[in-house]
Amino acid sequence: MDSLVVSNIRQRPLRSAISIIGVALGVALVMLFTGLAHGMSDDLQKRSSNVTAEIIFTRPGSMGLTTSSANLSTKYAELLKEVEGVESTTPVIRYFYPSGSFGVDQVEGIEWDSFSKMNNIRLIQGHAPVADDEIVIDETKAARNHPVGSSLKVFGPKLYRVAGIYAPESGARAKMSIGSLQRALESPDKCTFIFVKVKNPSDQVAVARRIDAKFPGNKIQFTREVFASIENSIPGLNIFLRVLVVLILLCSGQCSILNRSARLVHRRDWINFAMSRSH
């Protein structure tokens, strides 16, 4: 069997090379796109897991993995503190915007003092965002040639100045003051969701029930459940990967079929030529 394979490669080196390249290209593309998709979801999950709040309080339908809206009143941040078992709260606006030709990026509007204290993040350079044109970014984004004092286009044509760099990475890589993002989105006193930190993490279920009883009609999620299933929550990711694998395998198979068809046509032409010469 081995000698048959070797002899076939020696007799038809071009056809064999094309077949090998076609299969190798298909396998490489499957590995590339699958790795990119899983890498992006793993990165998002890692950044989200650095959030230490136990509960997310929001409006139904206001927050998805790639879409969000600011329709929750920030007044809830103070009202939630009155619930038994709640230690602290902080409102957040999460805004998604086009990045590059096909990508999507996000920016968060936060109250720096309450957000950084709750999630144990600190400034390693610069200062917190104060002015409407100031943002802070994490170390990963800063490493992409965005030092403190540089300008960065976050969304729209407006440039924002990098006021500081924070660590560890948590949520969106770029953050601005919640007031600045409210004015940019024309959504005064609104946010996308509110992080709720409970006094005793083991009581988070009971605290969530108290919140639901006091503020019915809103949506309450546990961060441990939201961030643990990020990959499964990405709309159509698994379907996209399956379709991608099938398409690439079909293309690789088609290359082999076309290669063989070309050889058969070439052989037929030689046979016809030989027969015509014999007559």
Question: How should these model regions be labeled?
Answer:
Residues 55-59, 141-142, 163-168, 188-214, ...:
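A short beta-strand structural signal in non-transmembrane regions
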Residues 4-11, 42-49, 53, 216, ...:
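Short amphipathic alpha-helical coupling elements at transmembrane boundaries
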Residues 17, 21, 49, 240-247:
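Alpha-helical transmembrane segments of multi-pass inner-membrane proteins
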Residues 1-28, 41, 231, 264:
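N-terminal Sec/SRP start-transfer signal
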Residues 210-265, 273, 279:
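Peri-transmembrane interface segments
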Residues 92-93, 101-111, 119-180, 190:
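Hydrophobic secondary-structure segments that place a key small or acidic residue at a functional site
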Residues 23, 41, 112-119, 129, ...:
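Structured catalytic cores of enzymes that bind and process phosphorylated ligands/cofactors
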Residues 28-106, 209-213, 217-219:
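Hydrophobic, regular-secondary-structure patches
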